[in-house]
């Protein structure tokens, strides 16, 4: 029998070895993705002539649509504003010379919109699906105090969860027939841990992450890549960030980096600064992360409510 001191030494040594091995593997993985890798999946017409992007008129969705068009893919844009859809479609055709198609659909509605989307996509050889459409809270809030809570619950489920499942249901069979295709599901870093004061949003994005990773495991042997994309803050209308920075990139910068991870990571934070933040959070105890998130969101909530009071 080892004396207590000897046992503690071996426990410490094994713990240090585990940490060193984990750190080395993490470093190798990071080099593979951010240093050497350029994305195994050649996102372009070789996967199929068309890319389909939901929530395509702003932010990350618009950036994906333009990046895929730049790679030679025709793009089907789906969003609720016909005016914005036509504007983005015009920009894409003018800049990249590819065919576009617009489908007007409000994902906050019930399931009947999917018959219209199905009809709009009929006959298209779809190689890439970007499930980007999503909504969040207007500001962090305690669940029961969320404004118009019942409506918010319905919309959050319909837009953040139902759309991902239904769009995948429409597009995946055609990909399976050709044994190739890529589905990019835009989740959020808020789905990596329960996020107090954004609880419903966080839970909906955790669903997207689990759905994506499970689907990838089911269909990767059949030539289908499914990726969960989990950004931190990006300078978009939804995030209310107008000035980009190193850790809060423009949608275009973020998407260029994220596309490079396709085929290398089934779950990605998308760009190097966000990957670093994800790594830092991953080594912290869950309780610590949740306490930090609670503190941060309480501060954001207080600032929002104070500003709202001044405007009255």
Swiss-Prot record:
Compartments it resides in: Endoplasmic reticulum membrane
Residues bound to substrate: 188
TM stretches of this protein: 33-53, 181-201, 274-294
Keyword Lipid metabolism listed: yes
Catalytic activity as recorded in UniProt: a very-long-chain (3R)-3-hydroxyacyl-CoA + NADP(+) = a very-long-chain 3-oxoacyl-CoA + NADPH + H(+); 17beta-estradiol + NAD(+) = estrone + NADH + H(+); 17beta-estradiol + NADP(+) = estrone + NADPH + H(+); 3-oxooctadecanoyl-CoA + NADPH + H(+) = (3R)-hydroxyoctadecanoyl-CoA + NADP(+)
Active site: residue positions: 201 (proton acceptor)
InterPro entries in alphabetical order: NAD(P)-bd_dom_sf, Sc_DH/Rdtase_CS, SDR_fam, VLCFA-Steroid_DH
GO molecular function: estradiol 17-beta-dehydrogenase [NAD(P)+] activity; very-long-chain 3-oxoacyl-CoA reductase activity
The entry's keywords: Endoplasmic reticulum, Lipid biosynthesis, Lipid metabolism, Membrane, NADP, Oxidoreductase, Steroid biosynthesis, Transmembrane, Transmembrane helix
Membrane topology term: Multi-pass membrane protein
Source taxon at top rank: Eukaryota
Pathway assigned to this chain's UniProt record: Lipid metabolism; fatty acid biosynthesis; Steroid biosynthesis; estrogen biosynthesis
Enzyme class: oxidoreductase
EC number from the UniProt entry: 1.1.1.330, 1.1.1.62
Gene Ontology biological process: estrogen biosynthetic process; fatty acid biosynthetic process
Entry keyword Cytoplasm: no
UniProt similarity note: Belongs to the short-chain dehydrogenases/reductases (SDR) family. 17-beta-HSD 3 subfamily.
Function field: Catalyzes the second of the four reactions of the long-chain fatty acids elongation cycle. This endoplasmic reticulum-bound enzymatic process, allows the addition of two carbons to the chain of long- and very long-chain fatty acids/VLCFAs per cycle. This enzyme has a 3-ketoacyl-CoA reductase activity, reducing 3-ketoacyl-CoA to 3-hydroxyacyl-CoA, within each cycle of fatty acid elongation. Thereby, it may participate in the production of VLCFAs of different chain lengths that are involved in multiple biological processes as precursors of membrane lipids and lipid mediators.
Name the UniProt record assigns to this protein: Very-long-chain 3-oxoacyl-CoA reductase
Provenance organism: Anas platyrhynchos (Mallard)
Gene: HSD17B12
């Amino acid at each position: 029998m080892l004396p207590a001191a000897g046992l503690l030494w071996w426990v410490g040594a094994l713990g240090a070895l585990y940490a060193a091995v984990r750190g080395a593997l993490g470093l190798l993985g990071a080099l593979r993705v951010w240093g050497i890798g350029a994305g195994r999946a050649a996102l372009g017409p070789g996967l199929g002539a068309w890319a389909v992007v939901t929530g395509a008129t702003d932010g990350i969705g618009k950036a994906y649509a333009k990046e895929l068009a730049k790679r030679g893919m025709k793009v089907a844009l789906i969003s609720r504003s016909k005016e914005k859809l036509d504007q983005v479609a015009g920009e894409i055709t003018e800049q990249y010379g590819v065919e576009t198609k617009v489908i007007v659909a409000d994902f906050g509605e019930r399931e009947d919109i999917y018959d219209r989307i199905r009809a709009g996509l009929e006959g298209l050889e779809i190689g890439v699906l970007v499930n980007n459409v999503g909504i969040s809270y207007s500001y962090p809030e305690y669940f029961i105090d969320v404004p118009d809570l019942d409506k918010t619950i319905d919309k959050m489920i319909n837009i953040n969860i139902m759309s991902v499942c239904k769009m995948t249901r429409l597009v995946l069979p055609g990909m399976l027939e050709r044994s190739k295709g890529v589905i990019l599901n835009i989740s959020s870093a808020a789905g990596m841990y329960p996020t107090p004061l954004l609880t419903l949003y966080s839970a909906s994005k955790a669903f997207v992450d689990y759905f994506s990773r499970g689907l990838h495991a089911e269909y990767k042997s059949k030539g289908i890549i499914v990726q969960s994309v989990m950004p931190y803050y990006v300078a978009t209308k939804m995030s209310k960030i107008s000035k980009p920075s190193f850790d809060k990139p423009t949608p275009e910068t973020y998407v260029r980096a994220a596309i490079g991870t396709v085929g290398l990571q089934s779950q990605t934070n998308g760009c190097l600064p966000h990957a670093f933040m994800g790594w830092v959070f991953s080594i912290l105890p869950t309780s610590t992360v949740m306490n930090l998130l609670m503190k941060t969101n309480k501060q954001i909530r207080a600032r929002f409510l104070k500003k709202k009071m001044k405007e009255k």
